[in-house]
């Protein structure tokens, strides 16, 4: 799965969970711009695991991560599990 596919899945998940228009989201969009707190972010990351079929080794996210940062984390964890 490439970066753009992961980003599109994240945007769809954010739309489903929080009602945010996917067209208003891009890679630079941050957690605070979406309007979710850190607990909701962790909950969403668990949904990402389920949706994409892998398990995060670590969910070490910086404060207020962008969607690009989350995509990077997803790609790293998916690559480790496919190796």
Model-derived regions, located:
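Phosphopantetheine-dependent thiolation modules in NRPS/PKS and related acyl-activating systems
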Residues: 2-34, 39-45, 50-83
